[in-house]
């Protein structure tokens, strides 16, 4: 027991004289490690009588706890001193401005789509989506586009095989809606479309929004009124708008819509017309009872006109210097 008492006193004295955490850890190993001085005393248990063993074992455990408690106390003291020294060495100038994070912003094409959806949503139009990989019936046949129409040519359309292609327009969404829902219908279908073209005003992938209204006694005057209001709302100006006759296989009569630009020239912005009876028949709607109108617009085209962008390709080059202008 005398030897144990001396070892504990030596350990406590060493802990008191320790200068840092490393020295404390060395002391812990020297006295409490597997080969430490206090641990080695347990080997004496074999030389003791049955009556002495419990008392000696208890004394060794008490010694361990005493040394461990002193080590823990001293370690906390050193950690506190280290933290205090670190804080004293670090100086913070509270007058410096904070580190700001740039807020993200919507892509200009997304802004335009949301603006279009908002306007037509207030008129009762719902947003419909459809597949971007389309079959020839929904992309061409049901839209009254003949087998020999130029739009079906390989140089205009990306084909997977003669019957399957990347959609060239979102009109297929209108066909699918009319196949599954009964009139009255009011829908718009925004989405990506694909055509084999690439220059300052065309890219192989771009965005369209097409609209469809089918009901009884629908007429061209309603179409003109809605599109006229839309264009004035979108450009936030009292624009001059004109409708001029045109041709689309899926509408009859058909028109293209122009607005007067700031340079005094007419600018084409969208196409429209009354839904062709053949299109209604292809989806099982009686053209004698129902009529409708449809319209389609290129999102990038409208965005270019609204923001004065000259090159459509800039929307897809991910240049932050360009995109940050629309935040």
Curated annotation (Swiss-Prot):
Pfam families referenced in this protein's UniProt entry, alphabetically: Phe_tRNA-synt_N, tRNA-synt_2d
Segment forming the signal sequence: none
UniProt keyword annotation of ATP-binding present: yes
Cofactor note: Binds 2 magnesium ions per tetramer.
Disulfide bonds: none
Catalytic reaction(s) noted: tRNA(Phe) + L-phenylalanine + ATP = L-phenylalanyl-tRNA(Phe) + AMP + diphosphate + H(+)
EC code: 6.1.1.20
Top-level class of the enzyme under EC nomenclature: ligase
Keywords attached to this entry: Aminoacyl-tRNA synthetase, ATP-binding, Cytoplasm, Ligase, Magnesium, Metal-binding, Nucleotide-binding, Protein biosynthesis
InterPro entries assigned to the protein according to its UniProt record, in alphabetical order: aa-tRNA-synth_II, aa-tRNA-synth_II/BPL/LPL, Phe-tRNA-synth_IIc_asu, Phe-tRNA_ligase_II_N, Phe_tRNA_ligase_alpha1_bac, Phenylalanyl-tRNA_Synthase, tRNA-bd_arm
Cofactor(s) demanded: Mg(2+)
Family of the protein in this entry: Belongs to the class-II aminoacyl-tRNA synthetase family. Phe-tRNA synthetase alpha subunit type 1 subfamily.
Protein's name according to its UniProt entry: Phenylalanine--tRNA ligase alpha subunit
Gene this chain is encoded by: pheS
């Amino acid at each position: 027991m005398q030897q144990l008492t001396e070892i504990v006193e030596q350990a406590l004295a060493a802990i008191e004289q320790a200068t840092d955490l490393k020295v404390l850890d060395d002391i812990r190993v020297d006295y409490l490690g597997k080969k430490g001085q206090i641990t080695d005393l347990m080997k004496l248990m074999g030389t003791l009588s049955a009556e002495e063993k419990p008392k000696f074992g208890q004394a060794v455990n008490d010694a361990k706890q005493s040394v461990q408690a002193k080590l823990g106390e001293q370690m906390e003291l050193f950690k506190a001193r280290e933290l205090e020294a670190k804080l004293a060495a670090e100086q913070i100038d509270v007058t410096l401005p904070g580190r700001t994070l740039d807020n993200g912003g919507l892509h200009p094409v997304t802004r335009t789509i949301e603006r279009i959806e908002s306007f037509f949503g207030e008129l009762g139009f719902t947003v419909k989506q459809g597949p971007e990989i389309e079959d020839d019936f929904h992309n061409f046949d049901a839209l009254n586009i003949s087998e020999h129409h130029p739009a079906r040519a390989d140089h205009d359309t990306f084909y997977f095989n003669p019957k399957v292609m990347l959609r060239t327009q979102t009109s297929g969404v209108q066909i699918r809606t009319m196949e599954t829902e009964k009139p009255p219908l009011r829908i718009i279908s925004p989405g990506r479309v694909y055509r084999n073209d690439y220059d300052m005003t065309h890219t192989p992938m771009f965005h369209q929004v097409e609209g469809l209204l089918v009901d009884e006694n629908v007429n061209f005057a309603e179409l003109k009124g809605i599109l006229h209001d839309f264009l004035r709302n979108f450009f936030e100006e009292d624009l001059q708008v004109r409708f001029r006759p045109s041709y689309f296989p899926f509408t009859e009569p058909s028109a293209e819509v122009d607005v007067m630009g700031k340079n005094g020239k007419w600018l084409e912005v969208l196409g429209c017309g009354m839904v062709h009876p053949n299109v209604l028949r292809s989806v099982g709607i009686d053209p004698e009872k129902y009529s409708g109108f449809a319209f389609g617009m290129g999102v990038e085209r409208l965005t270019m006109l609204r923001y004065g962008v000259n090159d459509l390709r800039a929307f897809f080059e991910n240049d932050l210097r360009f995109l940050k202008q629309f935040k």
